[in-house]
Amino acid sequence: PGPWTGASDETEWTSSGNKAKLINNNSIDATENTMVLYRWKSWYSGIHESAVFTKYVDQAPLTASERAQWKAEAKALRAIYYFYLVRTYGPVPVLEDDYALDTPSNELQLSRSTVDRCFDFIVSELKEAQNAGLLEDASSDKTTGVGRIDKAIAQAFIIEALTYRASWLFNGECNY
């Protein structure tokens, strides 16, 4: 065995757990893989929380500039969560608005959006966030700016999304 064996189909997981058998037999799928489900659920939860935050932030006692900044950050986070989903799973359903809790289940069974739709949505949301109140340089404020999304971070995600869009993984309109 060479140093690259772990990255090939010659890998054998020697754990005694159930996942080892599934991996060794090439039969693992999303229903048995908690990591796959965790990412899907947590990123869509982030999208939902961003939408709910944006919907209700106007009721909070904030200044106009704080409100604009926080809405822009929520919009950028939503786009980033979509980018993570698309990068991991390929095209996903793009939800522009949050669904009400009493929405009939047949209306919630959405098909994947196209590759173009996903990336267009991600890039447009990030550009809107840049123009809607993101800070120029959040890291310059060492007390409240650390960890906040600013224009440079949004631009970095735009560049990364467009790079993925142009790559062989997503270049061409296919629905997988």
Go through each PLM region and give its residues.
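A structural signal for well-ordered alpha-helical segments within the folded catalytic domains
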Residues: 44, 48, 120, 152-157, ...
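Short coil/turn linking the two alpha-helices of tandem helical-hairpin repeats
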Residues: 86-87, 91-93, 164-173
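Short, conserved phosphate-binding/catalytic loop or strand-edge motifs used
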Residues: 95-103
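Aromatic-lined, polymer-binding surfaces characteristic
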Residues: 91, 144-156
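Acidic, serine/threonine/proline-rich low-complexity intrinsically disordered regions
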Residues: 98, 112, 169-176
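Hydrophobic alpha-helical membrane-insertion signals
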Residues: 1-9
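Conserved, well-structured interaction surfaces
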Residues: 14-89, 105-120, 124-146
